[in-house]
A protein has these predicted regions:
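N-terminal Rossmann NAD(P)H-binding glycine-rich loop of SDR-like oxidoreductase domains
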Residues: 14, 18-23
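Conserved mid-core alpha-helix of short-chain dehydrogenase/reductase
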Residues: 73-76, 123-130
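Rossmann-fold scaffold of SDR-type NAD(P)-dependent oxidoreductases
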Residues: 11, 88-98, 120, 155-158, ...
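Rossmann-fold cofactor-recognition segment
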Residues: 53-72
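C-terminal helical subdomain
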Residues: 199, 206-209, 214, 218-257
C-alpha cells in the first residue's frame, strides 16, 4: 500500500452523499488505494453516475452490489471485499446507506418502524460484525499508534434528529418518528461498538452531515453535498482516539445525545 493511502468501503454510493464521497475521495480528499463503492443495484439506471466514476478510475474504484437490509448480501460483500483488500485489510468503513420516513407518531405503523430499523440499524450492525475481521486485520498490521482512519475505523452517518436532547428544538418542523428512533438506536450501537472494540484500536464515530440538498434531504436543505462531504472528510482525517464514540456535526461541533 502506498504511504498514507487506505482501503475504504462506503455504502449507499449510487446517489446523494455516498456518490459525492466517492467523487471527492478519488479526487484526493482522502488518499485511497482501494475504494469499494457499494449500492443495491449498481447496474441500474440510478447508478449511472457511479458507473461513470468507476470507468474513469478502474484502478481505484470497485463497485460491489450490497443490500444492507439483507444479511446474505452483506456476507457476500464481505467475501468479495476480503479478496480485494487481501492481507492489508479494510481501514475505513463508512456506513452511509439509509432510508427516511417523515411520519409523525400517530401515522407511524409497526411496519414503518421495522423497515427503518432493518436498514438504518440492523444494516450497520451487520456491517460491523461481518467486516470486523478485515478491520482487525488492518489495525493489527498498522504501524500507526493510537486510533485513526489510516489504521481502522467505522464512521456512521447519523443525524441531529437522533439526538434525544434536541427533540423539542426540531420536532415541530420535522417529526419523522421512525427515522429519529432508528438514528437514536444507531447512536447507541456505535457507542457500544466504540467501547467493545477499543481494545482492538478500531475507531468508531458518528457524523451528522447537516441538512443537505439531496434526494433524501430535499431541495430546501441548507448545504450542498460537496461542502458537507468535504468537511466530514476533513473531520475524519483529523480523528484520533479522543474521537472514539463521538457524535459530531459536519463542522466538528459535538452533538448532545
Amino acid at each position: 500500500m502506498e504511504a498514507g493511502s487506505i482501503n475504504v468501503l462506503i455504502t449507499g454510493t449510487n446517489r446523494g452523499l455516498g456518490l459525492e464521497m466517492v467523487r471527492l475521495m478519488v479526487e484526493g480528499s482522502i488518499p485511497v488505494k482501494k475504494l469499494i463503492a457499494c449500492c443495491r443495484d449498481p447496474d441500474g439506471p440510478r447508478a449511472e453516475a457511479l458507473q461513470t466514476l468507476g470507468e474513469q478510475h478502474p484502478d481505484i474504484i470497485s463497485i460491489v452490489p450490497l443490500d444492507i437490509s439483507d444479511i446474505c448480501s452483506i456476507k457476500e460483500c464481505a467475501q468479495r471485499v476480503g479478496a480485494l483488500v487481501g492481507s492489508e485489510g479494510l481501514n475505513l468503513l463508512v456506513n452511509n446507506a439509509g432510508i427516511i420516513n417523515r411520519s409523525p407518531l400517530l401515522e407511524s405503523s409497526c411496519e414503518d418502524m421495522r423497515t427503518l430499523f432493518n436498514t438504518n440499524i440492523l444494516g450497520p450492525m451487520n456491517m460491523i460484525k461481518e467486516f470486523l475481521p478485515l478491520l482487525r486485520t488492518a489495525a493489527e498490521s498498522s504501524k500507526i499508534s493510537g486510533m485513526s482512519i489510516r489504521k481502522a475505523a467505522v464512521v456512521s452517518i447519523s443525524s441531529l434528529l437522533g439526538s434525544v436532547q434536541n427533540v423539542t428544538k426540531t420536532y415541530e418542523n420535522f417529526s419523522a418518528v421512525p427515522y429519529r428512533v432508528s438514528k437514536c438506536a444507531l447512536n447507541m450501537l456505535t457507542t457500544c461498538a466504540a467501547t467493545e472494540f477499543r481494545k482492538d484500536e478500531i475507531l468508531f464515530s458518528l457524523l451528522h452531515p447537516g441538512w443537505v440538498r439531496t434526494d433524501m434531504g430535499g431541495n430546501n436543505g441548507l448545504i450542498d453535498a460537496p461542502e458537507s462531504v468535504q468537511k466530514m472528510f476533513d473531520l475524519m482525517a483529523s480523528m484520533t482516539e479522543k474521537h472514539n464514540g463521538s457524535f459530531l456535526d459536519y463542522q466538528g461541533q459535538t452533538i448532545a445525545w
